[in-house]
Regions:
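Helix-to-loop junctions at the C-terminal end of transmembrane segments
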Residues: 94-114
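Pair of pore-lining "gating" transmembrane helices in MFS-fold secondary transporters
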Residues: 39-66, 155-159
Length: 242
């Protein structure tokens, strides 16, 4: 994707010719931008939508901030957390067209409700790896329980995203006064601002409390942790709620 973006940038730089007949659009001042933000954020229904969908993206953000360290600390370096990040876009690519067609005639709030009901199930699924005593065998293949439940949980997140994405901007535009739909659609993405701040801070807190860095533990506890990663014993009690 980075290579494709670079090629596109070069093509635009070399071949794009601006339309000389096009009129120059008026640029909003800072005051006008702030006035538009106040108009949007003072709408209680719109603000509620921002905060609700921020919770959705915060769960996903918290996962991606915490997942690499969580996998390495609980399963070991044999398991590559960077591969887990590909599951969500794969699920979205496979199912987004089908789900978008399915919810095409739904009310926006119904599609959003389905997504909001699914997203906590993804967190429960990923936490359920602690219920397994050993590796999971599927079609003769042994899979670490963290890997198995991560795949399930991230897949649920991808499906939830397919239900949310086609409709939440439509619902946001419905809250706007006539002629202000563009302003509301622009500020609808404020949800990611709140989501990433919360997800970033919360992921660090959860890791430190429930899945600490092995190097910060007592030598005996670190040795027990290293042995557990090699399958030579249980995880120390410091990781019992991870």
């Amino acid at each position: 994707s980075a290579g494709a973006s670079l090629v596109a940038l070069i093509v635009v730089a070399l071949f794009y010719v601006p339309d000389k007949d096009a009129t120059t659009g008026k640029t909003d001042s800072v005051r006008e931008t702030l006035r538009g933000m106040w108009l949007a954020m003072s709408n209680l229904r719109f603000l509620a939508l921002i905060l609700i969908t921020a919770g959705f993206w915060a769960i996903q953000g918290q996962l991606y901030f915490a997942m690499p360290e969580y996998v390495l600390r609980m399963a070991g370096e044999t398991y590559k957390p960077e591969w887990y990040a590909n599951i969500n876009p794969l699920v979205v690519v496979i199912f987004v067209v089908m789900i978008t067609q399915m919810v095409r005639k739904w009310k926006p709030q119904n599609s959003i409700l389905v997504a909001m009901c699914m997203i906590p199930l993804s967190a429960v699924a990923m936490a359920a790896s602690a219920w397994f005593d050993g590796n999971v065998t599927i079609l003769g293949l042994e899979i670490h329980p963290i890997t198995f439940m991560m795949i399930i949980g991230i897949s649920i997140q991808g499906l939830a995203e397919c239900f949310l994405s086609p409709k939440w901007l439509e619902f946001a535009s419905l809250q706007a006064p006539p002629g202000k739909e563009g302003t509301f659609l622009g500020f609808a993405h404020m949800n990611t601002f709140f989501a990433w701040i919360f997800g970033f801070i919360f992921s660090g807190f959860l890791l430190e409390k429930y899945c600490p860095e092995p190097g910060t533990l007592a030598p005996a506890v670190k040795a027990a942790h290293d042995a557990a990663l090699l399958g030579q014993g249980p995880m120390p009690v410091e990781y019992s709620q991870a």
